[in-house]
Amino acid sequence: MSIQTQDSQETLKSLSLIAAHSHISGLGLDENLQPKPSSQGMVGQLQARRAAGVILKMVQNGSIAGRAVLVAGPPSTGKTALAMGLSQSLGKDVPFTAIAGSEIFSLELSKTEALTQAFRKSIGIKIKEETELIEGEVVEIQIDRSITGGHKQGKLTIKTTDMETIYELGNKMIEGLTKEKVLAGDVISIDKASGKITKLGRSFARSRDYDAMGADTKFVQCPEGELQKRKTVVHTVSLHEIDVINSRTQGFLALFTGDTGEIRSEVRDQINTKVAEWKEEGKAEIVPGVLFIDEVHMLDIECFSFINRALEDEFAPIVIMATNRGISKTRGTNYKSPHGLPLDLLDRSIIITTKNYDASEIKTILTIRSTEEEVELSPEALDLLTNIGSETSLRYSSNLISVSQQIAQKRKSNTVEVKDVERAYLLFLDSARSVKFVQEFESQYIDDKGQVNISIGKDEDAMDTTA
C-alpha cells in the first residue's frame, strides 16, 4: 500500500487596511505656514489649511490652551481630513484625542464623565526622572547553577574603553540576562533602580566573530568613560492615565481592559494638586494637546454647558469641533442656532469654514486615493469618476474606486476602464438616485405610521373577503 502526500502552500496576506484618511500625512504647509495646492495628501481648502496652520503653531508653542475651534462646512469638504492632517503634523509628543459626538452617550458612564475623560486624555504630562545606568560591553558572563536547583549565582565582567569591572549577579539579574539573550561582546544598559536590562547592540570589535548575522543585528561602539552614568529620562503620560492608575488598587490593569468606570472628582483634584507641585519644582511639564469632536451637533445642551466650563479650567486642551449643520435646533432645546451650537459656545469659538471642491481638486484627490488603494485607473475612467464626484459627492466617487477594481478583476484586467466604472455606477446608487427611487415607489415602503400598500397594482386580482 502506498501513501501519497500532497504539499500545499498558502500565502498569508499581511493586514493592510486602508481607511478613508490613511493617505493624509500632514497639513501640506511650507515653512511659512502657507498651504501648497497639493501636498501630504491634502488638496485645496487653502484658506482652511492656512487657519489650521495657525492653530498648529499655537499648539506647538504650548502657551495657549482652552481655546475652541469650530470647523464648519458642507458634507464631503474635508473637515475630518483637516483634523487628521493636524494630528499628523503635531507628531507623537502632543496628545491628540478624536471622538465622535455620539460616543459620549453610554449606559456605563455619564455624559460629563465621558467628556472629562476625553479632555484629560488630551493633556500630556512630561515627567523628568534622573536614573543611574550602567553602560558597557560584556566581556564575560559566569553563571553557577546549583545541582539541587537552588539559587543561581554569577559574575558579570563589563567594560568601557577606559575601565573594566566585575559585578556579582543575583537570581533576578541572571534571569534578565538570560531573557535578553546577552552574550559576550554585547553592549548593554542596566537601570540600577529597576534592574531593567536593555540590549543596545553588538560591539564593533566582535563584528568578525560570526560569518553570518541576523538582519536585526546592530553594531555599536564600545561606550567611553565611566561605567555608571546619570541620565535624564522623560516619560510622557496623559492626565487620564494618571487618573486611572490612582483610582483603584490595580488601576494600571484598567488601562489595558478599558474598564475605567466613573473616577471620583476627589482623585482628580489630588492629581491636579500634585501635578501643579511637580510643575513648580521643575519635575514635570504640562503639554496641552488637542481634543477633536466630530459631528459636534450630536451633543446636547448639557454637554455644551460642560464644555463651556471645561474650557476655562487650568488643564484644558484646544478643542476642535466639526459640524455640517446650518441653522438647526440645538439638541435638548427648541431653539434654532447656527450649526446647532448654543450662541455662548459659538461666541467662544474661532470658526474655520470649508467649501466644496471643484472638478480639478476632485480629480487630484481621486488620483491620490487610487494610488493609496493600489488601483490603476485609465485616464478615461478617472475623468468619469471626476464627473460623478462633481455631480454626486466625493465620498461616493471614491467608494466606486475599489468597487470598480473588483469588477475589472472579474474580467481578468488590472486596469479599471470606463465600462467598469459605469457598471459600478449602475449597481450602486448615490444618495440623489436613492431618494428618487424611494419617492417613485413610496407606496410600497412602510411609512412612519407603520402602514404599507402591499398590492402591486389597482387592477390586480385581490383576495375575496366578502364571504
Curated annotation (Swiss-Prot):
Keywords: Activator, ATP-binding, Chromatin regulator, DNA damage, DNA repair, Helicase, Hydrolase, Nucleotide-binding, Nucleus, rRNA processing, Transcription, Transcription regulation. GO terms for cellular component: nucleus. PANTHER family: RUVB-RELATED REPTIN AND PONTIN (PTHR11093). GO terms for biological process: chromatin organization; DNA repair; rRNA processing. One of its GO terms (molecular function) is helicase activity. It catalyses: ATP + H2O = ADP + phosphate + H(+). Transmembrane segments: none annotated. DNA helicase which participates in several chromatin remodeling complexes, including the SWR1 and the INO80 complexes. The SWR1 complex mediates the ATP-dependent exchange of histone H2A for the H2A variant HZT1 leading to transcriptional regulation of selected genes by chromatin remodeling. The INO80 complex remodels chromatin by shifting nucleosomes and is involved in DNA repair. Also involved in pre-rRNA processing. It comes from the Eukaryota. It is found in: Nucleus. Signal peptide: none annotated. Belongs to the RuvB family. Disulfide bonds: none annotated. ATP binds at G73, P74, P75, S76, T77, G78, K79, T80. Pfam families: TIP49 (PF06068), TIP49_C (PF17856). The gene is RVB2. This is RuvB-like helicase 2. It comes from Kluyveromyces lactis (strain ATCC 8585 / CBS 2359 / DSM 70799 / NBRC 1267 / NRRL Y-1140 / WM37) (Yeast). Its EC number is 3.6.4.12. May form heterododecamers with RVB1. Component of the SWR1 chromatin remodeling complex, the INO80 chromatin remodeling complex, and of the R2TP complex.
